């Protein structure tokens, strides 16, 4: 009896794994596949545009090819998503969440920097030279921004894996508040007769 009372109210690992397998293989299998394919495709598609821009602006110095870094992160994230769909596991969910968060931040920073570089570079170049370069830069930025949006949707999809969590938390908080208010009412009723008897003794 005591063991059952002291046992934490948490799901067993086997039950959690079964729910995760149902979520990844049946409920969200199609969406995970679309996410993984989109991330891998965007990561590969931005490579030629980024290298072309780098070769035209800085003699093929890949260090300046900033969109390559979120592209590599997106490729890794897509592989993790495919692995989660193939063989669901708790640590893969955490790895997918961390990689998507990192990819979102890195991609957003890359987009902001590339947009600023494009705006400043276009103003200083001739119109005949800037047209082709502008198309390549905008294409690389569009693919990077698409990767950011895909990572955002992936994080949203992961947050919906346990939709009742926040509702249960609010319900427990409400029950706790009601319990505290009931305790205050009971303590007030218990202190009432004591105060009244003290007043009667004072009058006597």
UniProtKB/Swiss-Prot annotation:
<keyword id="KW-1133">Transmembrane helix</keyword>
<feature type="transmembrane region" description="Helical">
    <location>
        <begin position="62"/>
        <end position="82"/>
    </location>
</feature>
<keyword id="KW-0472">Membrane</keyword>
<dbReference type="GO" id="GO:0016020">
    <property type="term" value="C:membrane"/>
</dbReference>
<protein>
    <recommendedName>
        <fullName>Transmembrane protein 253</fullName>
    </recommendedName>
</protein>
<feature type="region of interest" description="Disordered">
    <location>
        <begin position="184"/>
        <end position="204"/>
    </location>
</feature>
<feature type="transmembrane region" description="Helical">
    <location>
        <begin position="138"/>
        <end position="158"/>
    </location>
</feature>
<dbReference type="InterPro" id="IPR038874">
    <property type="entry name" value="TMEM253"/>
</dbReference>
<feature type="transmembrane region" description="Helical">
    <location>
        <begin position="33"/>
        <end position="53"/>
    </location>
</feature>
<feature type="transmembrane region" description="Helical">
    <location>
        <begin position="96"/>
        <end position="116"/>
    </location>
</feature>
<keyword id="KW-0812">Transmembrane</keyword>
């Amino acid at each position: 009896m005591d063991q059952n009372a002291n046992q934490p109210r948490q799901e067993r690992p086997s039950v959690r794994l079964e729910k995760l397998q149902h979520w990844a293989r049946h409920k969200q299998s199609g969406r995970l596949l679309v996410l993984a394919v989109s991330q891998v495709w965007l990561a590969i598609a931005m490579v030629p545009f980024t290298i072309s821009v780098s070769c035209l602006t800085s003699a093929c110095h890949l260090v300046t090819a900033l969109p390559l870094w979120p592209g590599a992160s997106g490729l890794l994230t897509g592989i993790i998503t495919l692995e989660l769909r193939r063989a669901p596991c708790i640590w893969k969910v955490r790895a997918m969440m961390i990689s998507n968060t990192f990819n979102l931040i890195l991609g957003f920073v890359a987009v902001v920097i590339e947009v600023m570089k494009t705006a400043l570079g276009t103003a200083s170049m001739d119109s005949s030279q800037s047209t082709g370069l502008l198309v390549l830069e905008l294409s690389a930025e569009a693919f990077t921004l698409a990767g950011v949006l895909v990572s955002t949707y992936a994080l949203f999809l992961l947050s919906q894996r346990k939709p009742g969590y926040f509702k249960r938390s609010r319900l427990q908080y409400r029950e706790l508040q009601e319990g505290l208010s009931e305790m205050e009412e009971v303590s007030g009723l218990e202190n009432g007769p004591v105060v009244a008897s003290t007043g009667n003794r004072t009058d006597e």
